[in-house]
């Protein structure tokens, strides 16, 4: 048998001059693996083509990943609306009176409204009382004037009666009696006319609500 050579260093095969041996090929390819495939130029063109036109799946994924902003982040200005305290429009519902289950706030609102209404009623009551007092004062004044008129009429009647007695005692004629009766009638008629004219001038007020 021929003697075999032992190679301690794996790179010694190249130095020894053995080019076609399997050990030399293994030493060259040791640590580096080359891919046996298509050339670089074609692969580069395929990558650029895929980047230029994205697939449908990529578009769907992008749409799904879109960020959603809240109303506070967008800072949308709120419109001027009349909403009671503690009432907010719930998101996703129609506009309307959707009240929150807050009994305290509702009680405060009712108390404010009731106080305003009571104030209006009180003012109406005060006005009605004032008008009633004015009417009573006018009635008292009219009664006083009527009493004064009657007193004057009685005085004139008494004076005329005294005159009649004197005329009878002195033996006066009937003409004097007729004149006295006319004077009494004229005075009484004048008194009633004066009262009627005053009543016409009186102002009537509308009844309070």
UniProtKB/Swiss-Prot annotation:
Component of the 66S pre-ribosomal particle. Keywords: Coiled coil, mRNA transport, Nucleus, Ribosome biogenesis, Transport. Residues 20-33, 135-159 have a biased composition (Basic and acidic residues). GO terms for molecular function: mRNA binding. Belongs to the LOC1 family. Residues 1-53, 135-209 are annotated as: Disordered. It comes from Neurospora crassa (strain ATCC 24698 / 74-OR23-1A / CBS 708.71 / DSM 1257 / FGSC 987). It is found in: Nucleus, Nucleolus. The keyword Nucleotide-binding does not apply. One of its GO terms (cellular component) is nucleolus. Residues 126-170 form a coiled coil. PANTHER family: 60S RIBOSOMAL SUBUNIT ASSEMBLY/EXPORT PROTEIN LOC1, 60S RIBOSOMAL SUBUNIT ASSEMBLY_EXPORT PROTEIN LOC1. The keyword Transport applies. Required for efficient assembly and nuclear export of the 60S ribosomal subunit. GO terms for biological process: intracellular mRNA localization; mRNA transport; ribosomal large subunit biogenesis. This is 60S ribosomal subunit assembly/export protein loc-1.
